[in-house]
C-alpha cells in the first residue's frame, strides 16, 4: 500500500487541491491518503488550510494516520499536550486505518503512557 502524506510546510507538495489531483491518478485501494495530524494542524494554524479539510475531502481514501500533537505550529508533540481535537479525528478514521504515533525523541515513558491513554479515551486507538 502506498500513502501520500499531507506535508508540514506550505511549499511542500501536496496541499489539498494537489492531493486531489494525485489521488485521482490512481483509484486502486492500495494507493491512498496518509493523514498527518500535526501537519494538518500546523497549516490550519497558519491560515493556509481550512480546518478539517483533509479528512472532509479524503477520508474515503484514508489508509493511515500519523498521530501527534501540535502546540502552535510546533509539531511532533505527544497527543493530548497540544491543540488538536483527536475526538473529531477519531470519528473519521476507518477501522482498517494504520495508526502510527509519531512523537519527539525526547518523550518520557510516563509521557508516552499518558499519550496512549489519551488516544484510547479519544477513540483514536482501541485500547491501551
Describe the predicted segments one by one:
Residues 1-12, 34-35:
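Aromatic-lined carbohydrate-recognition surfaces of secreted/lumenal glycan-active proteins
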Residues 13-128:
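Histidine-acidic metal/acid-base catalytic patches
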Amino acid at each position: 500500500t502506498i500513502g501520500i502524506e499531507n506535508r508540514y510546510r506550505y511549499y511542500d507538495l501536496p496541499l489539498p487541491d494537489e492531493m486531489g489531483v494525485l489521488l485521482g491518478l490512481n483509484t486502486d485501494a492500495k494507493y491512498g491518503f496518509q493523514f498527518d495530524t500535526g501537519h494538518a494542524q500546523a497549516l490550519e494554524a497558519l491560515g493556509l488550510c481550512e480546518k478539517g479539510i483533509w479528512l472532509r475531502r479524503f477520508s474515503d481514501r484514508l489508509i493511515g494516520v500519523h498521530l501527534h500533537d501540535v502546540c502552535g505550529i510546533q509539531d511532533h508533540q505527544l497527543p493530548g499536550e497540544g491543540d488538536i481535537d483527536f475526538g473529531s479525528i477519531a470519528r473519521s478514521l476507518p477501522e482498517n486505518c494504520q495508526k502510527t504515533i509519531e512523537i519527539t525523541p525526547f518523550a518520557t515513558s510516563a509521557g508516552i503512557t499518558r499519550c496512549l491513554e489519551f488516544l484510547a479515551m479519544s477513540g483514536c486507538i482501541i485500547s491501551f
